[in-house]
Structure formats: structure tokens, C-alpha cells
């Protein structure tokens, strides 16, 4: 099995083209106005049109109003919704669309292996559980966390995909994959030259190192 890769926080057409050339499986568009990588509805729709078949588009929200999500569904047409705030299971399922729920490891109530596993269980309809590190603001933190805290979640997850995020970059991805072996990884700032400005070289190197780990693990 190979590790799937999502690059999040894309804001430019050229970056999408370079991410696809590097071999990414999914791209993330941030629909949360509090993020430095925010794209508005019209911009998100334009960027979505740059994505070819067989590459997924994920739109990220943080505690959105229902009308915001419905507008994105209507005008952008994402393959997957990503909820990265305090959304309840009902908040996530109300749209009848596939979704992924993010958990900020280290937040209150998410600071032990057992607590993290318990927090995930109500979201049994999610297409995946994503694990990021906690920071005082919402959205991606760019920080790493203790990956050993996911052991109990992995035992619980069954066939549900686990997505590892939080401070990943070309220099630390091999170690993270060796410990967790997730279904997918999600990266943003770790492949940037500045907020929302992706580096083609860093994206290529990130994908290259993931492929090497996958090849070594499954040789």
C-alpha cells in the first residue's frame, strides 16, 4: 500500500499544476477566512477548475455557517469536506456529502491516547480522521505532536483512513511514516516558501521521500 498525499492551502494555479506534476493525490482549498491561505468562493471555484480527473479536491472549513458550506458545494463542487473546528457529528453529516473530521491533538480533552480515541468514535460516518497538532488558532498549526498518542486510535479505526498532519516537511516525513504508517498525510507550510506560496522543489522532495519510505516498508 502506498501513502496518499494531500497538499493543503493552495492559492495559485501554478502551485496546483506543480503539485499535480509532483504526484499529489488531493489538493486542499481553505474556505476559512481566518487563515492566511484563505480563498474566497470565486477564487476557490477558479482553482478547482485547474484540477484534473483522478485528483481530489478537499475544502476546509472551521465552524462554518451551513449556508457557507452549501455555497461551496454548489459553486466549487469539492470531492470531500474537511471540518477543522468544533463541529459536532450532526454538523458534519447534515449536508449528505462525504467528509473528513480533523482533531487537534493536545487541545483540552485531546491530550491522551484514550481521550483522542474517545473523541473520534462519534464521527463514525467520516471518510477519514485527520490528526493535527493543537495551536490557539484554528486551521493547520504547522507544529508536530507526539505520534505515539495515535496508537489507540489506530486500534479502533478498523478500515477507516487515518490522515497524519501537523508540521510535516521533507526532513521529518520519513520518521513520521515509520512510526504511524497512516493511510495519508496532509502538508501545507512544510512545502512552502511563504504562507500560501508553495515551493515546487519542496513538494517534489516531500513526495519523493514518501515514495522511498513506502518502497522500503513494502519491499
Curated annotation (Swiss-Prot):
Keywords tagged on the record: Amino-acid biosynthesis, Aromatic amino acid biosynthesis, Isomerase, Tryptophan biosynthesis
Catalytic activity: N-(5-phospho-beta-D-ribosyl)anthranilate = 1-(2-carboxyphenylamino)-1-deoxy-D-ribulose 5-phosphate
Domain of life assignment: Bacteria
Disulphide bridges: none
EC number: 5.3.1.24
GO BP annotations, alphabetical order: L-tryptophan biosynthetic process
Enzyme class, spelled out: isomerase
Pathway: Amino-acid biosynthesis; L-tryptophan biosynthesis; L-tryptophan from chorismate: step 3/5
MF-aspect GO terms: phosphoribosylanthranilate isomerase activity
Short name of any one Pfam family annotated for the protein: PRAI
Keyword Amino-acid biosynthesis appears in the UniProt entry: yes
Entry similarity comment: Belongs to the TrpF family.
Alphabetical list of PANTHER family matching this protein: N-(5'-PHOSPHORIBOSYL)ANTHRANILATE ISOMERASE
Protein name in the entry: N-(5'-phosphoribosyl)anthranilate isomerase
Species this chain originates from: Bordetella avium (strain 197N)
Gene giving rise to this polypeptide: trpF
Amino acid at each position: 500500500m502506498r501513502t496518499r498525499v494531500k497538499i493543503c492551502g493552495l492559492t495559485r494555479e501554478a502551485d496546483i499544476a506543480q503539485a499535480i506534476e509532483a504526484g499529489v493525490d488531493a489538493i486542499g482549498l481553505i474556505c476559512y477566512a481566518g487563515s492566511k491561505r484563505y480563498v474566497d468562493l470565486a477564487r476557490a471555484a477558479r482553482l478547482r477548475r485547474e484540477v484534473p480527473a483522478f485528483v481530489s479536491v478537499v475544502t476546509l472549513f472551521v465552524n462554518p455557517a451551513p449556508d457557507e458550506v452549501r455555497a461551496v458545494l454548489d459553486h466549487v463542487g469539492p470531492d470531500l469536506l474537511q471540518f477543522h473546528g468544533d463541529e459536532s457529528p450532526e454538523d458534519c453529516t447534515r449536508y449528505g456529502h462525504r467528509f473528513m473530521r480533523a482533531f487537534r491533538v493536545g487541545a483540552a480533552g485531546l491530550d491522551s491516547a484514550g481521550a483522542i480515541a474517545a473523541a473520534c468514535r462519534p464521527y463514525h460516518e467520516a471518510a477519514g480522521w485527520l490528526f493535527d497538532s493543537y495551536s490557539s488558532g484554528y486551521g493547520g498549526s504547522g507544529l508536530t505532536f507526539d505520534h505515539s498518542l495515535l496508537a489507540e486510535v489506530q486500534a479502533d479505526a478498523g478500515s477507516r483512513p487515518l490522515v497524519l498532519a501537523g508540521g510535516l516537511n521533507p526532513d521529518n516525513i520519513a520518521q513520521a511514516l515509520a512510526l504511524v504508517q497512516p493511510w495519508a498525510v496532509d502538508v501545507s507550510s512544510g512545502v512552502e516558501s511563504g504562507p500560501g506560496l508553495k515551493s515546487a522543489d519542496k513538494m517534489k522532495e516531500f513526495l519523493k521521500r514518501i515514495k522511498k519510505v513506502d518502497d522500503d516498508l513494502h519491499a
